[in-house]
């Protein structure tokens, strides 16, 4: 397990409002560029930014360079995409070099975008992360503490965090807005070369006239798709725990609030509980697809949403823990292989299916007494170890899996087109 943090940090280090499409490749790198500029005694003549590992492999599709240029505020920037460097301390490594008038480096800084928009350098955490707030590191310990003190998970958050409710209200408002924008969008396609069709609005329009349970499934799907499509379009979302998995938890909560009519306070309490589980994952493993694959992003999001759903259904502490465990256990080994490096295929549909699965996990957990053989903490440990075993091709480098299949397909079409001298035809596949 990761041992960088002594205990579980604030849930507000997990929930960040920002622009998609990637928390590590977009939000994190832009934050790093701003931080680097603030460190300079005088503005440099220019800046050279070298992106390594996953950032170099998929950064163009994640709009990494655009965010860096925006953060450096008009200073000339050279972006170097180094996909060959090995022995990196983290797959999302960035080096900033401040350059003088003659092009000589006057100041350098290496920083790591570790997921969820969070940063770390060789000295430790970077930025405005709050101090660790929870006295324990595992859900097992936190659950025992809650039982001993007669607290729910959300009450533990209330007791531990600094003024949580106004901050959670702000987070929820941003989540709600991202769902509504995604549903209201009249754009037919997402940006990028895939020309992927938006499906949230049509899913909503077609699904709301169905009979239950199909209607409920369709609405959950539409809400999750809405946020994921907004994220892919570079819209404002909340990391939960990342941009690439930002549709799962809001989709679940929006459904219970708008369809089932649960009051806003219940939603905020569920958001607090989900944040606690996500923070445990962040402290003990990783929420970065570049480090552990998509199990750390969508798997974590499903786990968080399952915990939230179980709480909204009236689950006990142990039933909530069980729901979260199921949500992660059945995403173990999930790869991160985005086609062309864009947070679109398989990411958007994956958010949708994880939202549906989270709802199922919550319902099933409440049909039990909450006792089970593999704990939430056990499965988080296995997730982290599994991620370490994944080849780099399956950790956000767009070199394996679906990304490789697509690349071979496009290469074959290019060769066929060159042989016949016919103009290239853009295909729209099932996604």
Regions found by a protein language model. Name each.
Residues 2-7, 12-16, 30-55, 61, ...:
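Non-transmembrane, aqueous-exposed alpha-helical and coiled segments at domain scale
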Residues 14, 18, 220-228, 270-278, ...:
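Short alpha-helical scaffolding segments that buttress acidic/His motifs in well-ordered protein cores
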Residues 15-33, 233-252, 294-302:
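Conserved phosphate/anionic-ligand binding catalytic regions in large, soluble enzymes, centered on
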Residues 26-39, 250-261, 306-314:
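Alpha-helical support elements that line or immediately flank enzyme active sites
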Residues 46-82, 269-313, 317-323, 329-361:
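A structural-propensity feature for long, helix-poor, extended segments
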Residues 74-209, 219:
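C-terminal regulatory domains involved in ligand/effector binding and gene-expression control
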Residues 166, 176-289, 293, 401-431:
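Accessory "access/gating" subregions that flank catalytic or transport cores
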Residues 309-431:
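Functionally critical mobile loop/hinge segments
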